[in-house]
């Protein structure tokens, strides 16, 4: 019933949007208001669906819970009849408190199991509208895009390919010639724009990127609400987010489009900027009223950075968590990063690596004045607020995934929380995160220690072996050396009568090798390997 209501709501929203597009200029404000209302409805429906799934999980274990509660009640009643003790609240035989706590613990366990099931769920894609995002400042990728589009048009007749509108008049891409070569209609090649994506974010079934990590971040910036699954081919300078090789696209694309796939729902952060205006005086009460204006909201995949910008002074930033003041940071800035962004700016500033499947917020200071201000990992449920202190000497600057840089005056603040719109990426392999940090960062890569004899010439190796055998033959067994050392040391101690003298010699004469105890070959010295 709820799924039908949600589908009807989506269809209604699409129809309303299509009707408004014809009168966009006249009804712009009305459309924005409707989109905000529908966004709130979508969030409510998502929460209701999650609650319904939790109810199903709880109902599956209701019989087991009832049996345990009945058993506990019988034990409590038995103790009460035999003159046993009372419960915590002073009443005999009451299991209300334990029942409530048991339900609470069961719900928490159900949430963890639900999260685990979602992370392991495989989704079957019915791809009809394929979107291709190309790194436009690399000319060589124009031809690779052409090759990919031609192959898809030939092998997937039901698929309509959408490419960047910048390629429409490109001679390198040559859409008309491409349709002739693939023997398909020109209507199967269409072009997407940012405005089209903002209005139809659920239109595409799969996004394929040709570029590097910056191309993936660009996809996140244009899909500010729902994001289709993203399959990224590594054709850039970095490769933390691009785990597919382009030379294997003929094998990987059919597997993704024809079979069930596993996606990683990467956490994004919802960042909202608020501008503080000068306080106004209420004419009735005479009190000052602080006016705050909401400027914009960004859903980011990597990090939000609040720094001092061109100012030579340190930033003074007040950090709040769930409404409580956590600390006042005097530093070059602060970084609030997602697990995906933990390998970017946050890592360079000394932050920790975080697996993308862990939902958390990595807070990393940039060159803090206090060395005790260390990076910290916070839960995704926390609501952060970073405010430019009124005592700050200069304004601050904020950037979202390195873009949309904006100046923050004294009193301005940014709220940071987990975004309801995750960023799904197609999983190439279960260990792709470890492979990426090992490949890009040389994580825990070290040279194996080599044997000393490997760098010796043949002549010196023979001399070394001869000397090793000579020392081995002269050395007495370790047990004999220990006995001699202990006996002679006791004799020397008796002769000294417990007094220290400059003439005392702590060395022990060894009849076999005439060496001091410190020169007696140790087991590691006596057993040579050539």
Curated annotation (Swiss-Prot):
Keywords: ATP-binding, Kinase, NAD, NADP, Nucleotide-binding, Phosphoprotein, Transferase. GO terms for molecular function: ATP binding; NAD+ kinase activity; NADH kinase activity. Residues 13-25 have a biased composition (Basic and acidic residues). Specifically phosphorylates NAD in the presence of ATP, dATP, or CTP as phosphoryl donors. The keyword NADP applies. Residues 499-508 have a biased composition (Acidic residues). Optimum pH is 8.0. Pfam families: NAD_kinase, NAD_kinase_C. Residues 1-27, 57-99, 486-530 are annotated as: Disordered. Belongs to the NAD kinase family. Present with 5040 molecules/cell in log phase SD medium. Residues 59-75 have a biased composition (Low complexity). Its EC number is 2.7.1.23. HAMAP family: NAD_kinase. Residues 88-99 have a biased composition (Polar residues). It catalyses: NAD(+) + ATP = ADP + NADP(+) + H(+). GO terms for biological process: intracellular iron ion homeostasis; NAD metabolic process; NADP biosynthetic process. It is an enzyme of class 2 (transferase). The keyword Ion transport does not apply. InterPro entries: ATP-NAD_kinase_N, ATP-NAD_kinase_PpnK-typ_C, NAD/diacylglycerol_kinase_sf, NADK. The modification Phosphoserine is found at residues 499, 503. GO terms for cellular component: cytoplasm; nucleus. This is NAD(+) kinase. Signal peptide: none annotated. Homohexamer.
